[in-house]
C-alpha cells in the first residue's frame, strides 16, 4: 500500500481493480484543515486520464505490474508482436495499446513492455533511437539561418524537424519523448 506521501510521479497504483500510473502528484497542506494529495493518473489499459484526491489518512494499493524488455517483431495488420529475447516468449498488443508508441516502432528494436497479470498492456520506446531519414526536402545552399530546420520523416514513420544539412539516408539520434532531433548518429 502507498500512503498519500508516497504517491509520486511514475508510481503505479491499483484503482478500481485496474493499473494506473501517476502522471502528476501535488501534496497540499492548507492552512486550515487536513492535508491531502491530489493526483492525476493515466489508465495503463485504455489510456484514460483522471484526477483523484486522497486525504492524509488514505492509502492506495500498488499495481503489480512488471516491465520487461522485449524485441518488436512485426505487425500482422491487427496486432503488434513482441518477443522476450531471454525466454523467446511472445506477446501481442492491439493497435490501441501501442497507439502512443506506434510512430517509433522499428523491427528488431528493444522496447519496454508492461505486463499485468501476465498480459501485455503497454509499450514504451527507448528514450533515444537512431533512425534513418526516409523523406526530407533538400537543403538549399546559402539557406543557413542559425537554428533553421526542415520537416523530415524517419524510417519508423514519425515526422520530426531536422537541421537543413540533414539529407535522405542520414542516420540521426532522436529523443522519442519529445520527438526532437538530437544529433547525427555516429558511425
UniProtKB/Swiss-Prot annotation:
Entries under SUPFAM superfamilies matching the protein: Nucleic acid-binding proteins, Translation proteins SH3-like domain
Molecular-function GO terms, alphabetical: translation elongation factor activity
Presence of the UniProt keyword ATP-binding in the record: no
Compartment list: Cytoplasm
A Gene Ontology biological process term: peptide biosynthetic process
Pathway: Protein biosynthesis; polypeptide chain elongation
Principal location: cytoplasm
Parts of the chain that traverse the membrane: none
GO cellular component entries: cytoplasm
Pfam families (alphabetical): EFP, EFP_N, Elong-fact-P_C
Record keywords: Cytoplasm, Elongation factor, Protein biosynthesis
Similarity comment: Belongs to the elongation factor P family.
Function: Involved in peptide bond synthesis. Stimulates efficient translation and peptide-bond synthesis on native or reconstituted 70S ribosomes in vitro. Probably functions indirectly by altering the affinity of the ribosome for aminoacyl-tRNA, thus increasing their reactivity as acceptors for peptidyl transferase.
HAMAP family with a match to the protein in the record: EF_P
Protein name listed in UniProt: Elongation factor P
Gene: efp
Amino acid at each position: 500500500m502507498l500512503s498519500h506521501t508516497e504517491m509520486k510521479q511514475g508510481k503505479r497504483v491499483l484503482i478500481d481493480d485496474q493499473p494506473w500510473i501517476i502522471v502528476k502528484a501535488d501534496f497540499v497542506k492548507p492552512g486550515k484543515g487536513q492535508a491531502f494529495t491530489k493526483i492525476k493518473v493515466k489508465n495503463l489499459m485504455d489510456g484514460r486520464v483522471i484526477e483523484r484526491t486522497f486525504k492524509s489518512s488514505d492509502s492506495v494499493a500498488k499495481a503489480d505490474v512488471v516491465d520487461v524488455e522485449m524485441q518488436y517483431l512485426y505487425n500482422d495488420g491487427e496486432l503488434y508482436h513482441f518477443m522476450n529475447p531471454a525466454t523467446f516468449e511472445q506477446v501481442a498488443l492491439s493497435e490501441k495499446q501501442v497507439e502512443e508508441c506506434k510512430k517509433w516502432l522499428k523491427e528488431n528494436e528493444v522496447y519496454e513492455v508492461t505486463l499485468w497479470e501476465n498480459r501485455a498492456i503497454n509499450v514504451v520506446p527507448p528514450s533515444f533511437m537512431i533512425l534513418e531519414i526516409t523523406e526530407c526536402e533538400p537543403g538549399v545552399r546559402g539557406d543557413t539561418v542559425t537554428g533553421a530546420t526542415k520537416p523530415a520523416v524517419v524510417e519508423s514513420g514519425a515526422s520530426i524537424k531536422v537541421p537543413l544539412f540533414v539529407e535522405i539516408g542520414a542516420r540521426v539520434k532522436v529523443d522519442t519523448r519529445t520527438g526532437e532531433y538530437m544529433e547525427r548518429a555516429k558511425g
